Curated annotation (Swiss-Prot):
A GO cellular component entry from the record: chloroplast
Subcellular location: Plastid, Chloroplast
Name listed for the protein in its UniProt record: (-)-kolavenyl diphosphate synthase, chloroplastic
EC code: 5.5.1.28
Annotated consequence of substituting F255H: Complete switch of product outcome from (-)-kolavenyl diphosphate to ent-copalyl diphosphate
Catalytic activity, reaction form: (2E,6E,10E)-geranylgeranyl diphosphate = (-)-kolavenyl diphosphate
Record key words, sorted: Chloroplast, Isomerase, Magnesium, Metal-binding, Plastid, Transit peptide
Enzyme class, broadest EC rank: isomerase
Comment block on domains: The Asp-Xaa-Asp-Asp (DXDD) motif is important for the catalytic activity through binding to Mg(2+).
């Protein structure tokens, strides 16, 4: 029996491509009735209504409407929503163009230390009277000073500092009395506070302020157990501070000099950065008080002017702001609107990049792993040449720290180091060590439910960490990451912890969140309409009769839509999904060698005939017909019929001969996507293209083998397998990452290179994630509404 007669044949065949009837028209109606498991529409929002029920095959050229329905997609958007979207984009662009030394909230604590400085000209008055004015104008109703988020450590420290400053200059006794009442009512409650929320250097700063208050005859209740405990911590920490070392080389102690005694200012002044001590206004104000140094004065005058009398807890914070703002745009899925601004941001960061890393501000003499990790990750993602040497000073004995010499493990610092380590190139062993260390640490914190950070109070840090651990970089589909981060990102409500609580206005910003939600909703609408079209195509092609399930259909579309998610990439997205579906359908057929040969021969021969006579010859086999119609419609208007036919012929030959289908499928998908996107044909022979093609197809072959081994495992060890992939796969992905994220002379475009990573990532995702996890992701990405 020949293959042409062995498969079920429909009694009526659609004449148009994809098996659809001729003269298809479109009728839109909104519906959100989805299957709870897979999100499959019960009432499709996009109906394809036939005006001609059937007919003989008269050529693909008559099916333009069906082609536009499936392959061009739809991008409906309310004009008012579009106008709001444009407004938000312009607002964010203006924010980025105005970036300078950092938009950050004022710290009452630091402002009080600045206000304490006596006029260096000898008048006996305050050097910065506007700082006293700021303090006077910013007391809260309960008598305290501090951030709008109530954290007692922050309120006590800020309030005592402001009371000391006002009392020193004999100003506003009523405000001082009100502040002292707040302190008296709350200071004993410090014993009940979560120590993870304790500001930087609190155990040094609070006793110093209490001692200052006593000299001013301010009565502070200091006999409570909580205060005695803080004094004990102060004494213990001071004993551990290497005073000789801090005078010999820069350390993080430069950030918290205020109140410390026995300092050699002549030596410490050598460690200034643009006039400041680690960009700390309070530390620099303390230095100015003792030294009358002109550089300290210039730095503080600039800061006080910038913030209208107040000063932040750190300034500048330009590296911090530039990097974290870019990171937020990327993770929210809106970075494509700001490519120019992102390039400018990263050019700025790279200008101050060193092989020892960076700090939160430029030209600092101390570096930290958090900023260095974020900088390394983003710079490498955008093709900058960065060395792994930046991580050497943060590693000791197999462990990694936030700041050299301090073996502290702040969650966000370790989280960002973990994210950076996943961009390793081959043989970058220190990144492998960093990944193992941080993954283990974060996992332990997760299982003990102790993901609380010392640097930030954010909406859902446990969720961010969980996503990073559960969906590694190689498997993280762009729309999936954005969907999760939309729920994790707190916008304006996120607050950072320094010496006091503070806000980074261009990092944690509701404007980003508003745009991201509008953009996601628009993309999701487009995807749902396309999915409805896909279901109609599936039914009209009778693919279910060939054994293809609707779950497989949905998975194929989800993978494509989660990666090439932009509305304008509809052709690429649908070509990707449909190619995947047809590959799976053909592979699922149980055919003899002869039947495979007949299938391939019929495809090749009819493709040649149709290319010669305009597409008038109808195949005898229904599945061959669907395939030929599909290829023809994908190429329609692009003149790529022959190239697509050849790509399919190569895959079919591999299938016929029992060759490596994982590798062949990757090649087919890449050629299809590139032809659908209009990539110039000359790029296919580019040396870098060939390198990427080889590396991608190789790793996809390994991933498909691994996935098949998982599926066929009869010993119940799937749970173990899904947590780790083979060494060969990891090495292959590292090599691919190096090829994609390294810029060379006469390189391919970033978008073209990224497409290779997208295909490899989709294979990795399906091999790595369990089926039930993927099902939950499908519902979340495609069908759950954004609130």
């Amino acid at each position: 029996m020949s293959f042409a007669t062995s498969l079920p044949r429909p009694t009526t065949t659609g004449a148009a491509g994809f098996g659809l009837p001729l003269a298809t028209c479109i009728s839109l109606s909104v519906s959100h009735s989805f299957s709870p498991k897979f999100g499959i529409c019960n009432n499709t929002s996009l109906r394809l209504k036939s005006k001609a029920g059937s007919g003989c095959y008269e050529g693909i050229h008559r099916s333009q409407l069906a082609a536009s329905t499936i392959l061009e997609g739809h991008t409906p958007i309310n004009p008012e929503v579009e106008s709001e979207k444009i407004r938000l984009i312009e607002r964010i662009r203006l924010m980025f163009r105005s970036m300078d030394d950092g938009e950050i909230s004022v710290s009452p604590y630091d402002t009080a230390w600045v206000a304490l400085v006596e006029d260096i000209g000898g008048s006996g008055g305050p050097q910065f009277p506007t700082s006293l004015e700021w303090i006077s104008n910013n007391q809260l109703d309960d008598g305290s000073w501090g951030d709008r988020k109530f954290v007692l450590y922050d309120r006590i420290l800020n309030t005592l500092a402001c009371v000391v400053a006002l009392t020193t200059w004999k100003m506003h006794p009523n405000k001082c009395e009100k502040g002292l009442r707040f302190i008296s009512d709350n200071i004993e409650k410090l014993a009940d506070e979560d120590e993870e929320l304790m500001p930087v250097g609190f155990e040094i700063a609070l006793p110093s302020l209490i001692d200052l208050a006593k000299r001013l005859c301010i009565e502070i209740p200091d006999n409570s157990a909580s205060i005695k405990n803080i004094y004990a911590k102060r004494d213990s920490k001071l004993k551990r501070i290497p005073m000789d070392l801090m005078h010999k080389k820069p350390t993080s102690l430069l950030f918290s000099l205020e109140g410390m005694e026995g300092l050699n200012w002549d030596k410490l002044l050598d460690f200034q950065s643009e006039g400041s001590f680690l960009s700390s206004p309070s530390s620099t104000a303390y230095a100015l008080h003792h030294t009358k140094d002109e550089l300290c004065l210039e730095y503080l005058l600039k800061a006080v002017k910038k913030f209208n009398g107040g000063v932040p807890n750190a300034y500048p914070v330009d590296m911090f702001e530039h990097l974290w703002s870019v990171d937020r745009l990327r993770r929210l899925g809106i970075s494509r609107y700001f490519q120019v601004e992102i390039d400018e941001c990263l050019d700025y960061v790279y200008r101050y990049w060193t092989n020892k890393g960076i700090c939160w501000a430029r030209n600092m003499c101390v570096q930290d792993s958090d900023d260095s990790s974020m900088g390394f990750r983003l710079l490498r993602l955008y093709g900058y040449d960065v060395s792994i040497d930046v991580f050497k000073q943060f590693e000791e004995g197999g462990q990694f720290c936030s700041i050299p010499g301090q073996m502290t493990h702040a969650i966000t610092g370790m989280y960002n180091l973990y994210r950076a380590s996943q961009l390793m190139f081959p043989q970058e062993h220190i990144l492998a060590d960093a990944r193992n260390f941080t993954a283990n640490l974060l996992h332990q914190k997760r299982v003990t439910n102790s993901i609380v950070d010392k640097w930030i109070i954010t909406k859902d840090l446990p969720g961010e960490v969980a996503y990073a651990l559960d969906v590694p970089f190689y498997a993280s589909l762009p729309r999936l990451e954005a969907r999760f981060f939309l729920e994790q990102y707190g916008g304006d409500d996120d607050v950072w912890i320094g010496k006091t609580l503070y806000r980074m206005l261009y990092v944690n910003c509701n404007t980003y969140l508003e745009l991201a939600k509008l953009d996601y909703k628009h993309c999701q609408t487009v995807h749902q309409l396309e999915w409805n079209s896909m279901q109609t195509w599936y039914r009209e092609c009778n693919l279910g009769e060939f054994g293809l399930s609707e779950r497989s259909l949905l998975l194929a579309y989800y993978i494509a839509a989660s990666t090439a998610f932009e509305p304008e990439k509809s052709s690429e997205r649908l070509a990707w999904a449909i190619t995947t579906i047809l590959v799976e359908t053909i592979m699922s057929q149980e055919l003899s060698d002869e039947q495979k040969r007949e299938f391939v021969d019929e495809f090749v021969n009819i493709s040649i005939i149709n290319n010669q006579n305009g597409g008038r010859y109808k195949p005898g086999n229904r599945l061959v017909e669907v395939l030929i119609n599909t290829v023809t419609l994908m190429a329609e208007g692009r003149g790529t019929d022959q190239q697509l036919s050849n790509a399919w012929k190569n895959w079919l030959k591999t299938w016929e001969e029992g060759g490596d289908l994982g590798e062949a499928e990757a090649r087919l998908l890449l050629h299809t996507i590139h032809l659908s996107s209009g990539l110039d044909e000359s790029s296919f022979s580019h040396p870098k293209y060939q390198q990427l093609l080889e590396a991608t197809s190789k790793v996809c072959h390994q991933l498909r083998l691994f996935q098949n081994l998982k599926a066929n495992d009869a010993q119940g060890s799937t749970s173990r397998l899904v947590t780790v992939t083979t060494f060969q796969i990891e090495a292959g992905m590292q090599e691919l990452v190096k090829l994609i994220f390294t810029k060379t002379l006469e390189d391919l475009t970033s978008a073209t290179k990224q497409s290779f990573f997208n295909i490899a990532r989709s294979f990795y995702y399906t091999a790595y994630c369990p089926a039930d996890t993927i099902d939950s992701h499908i519902n979340k990405v495609l069908f759950e509404k954004i609130v």
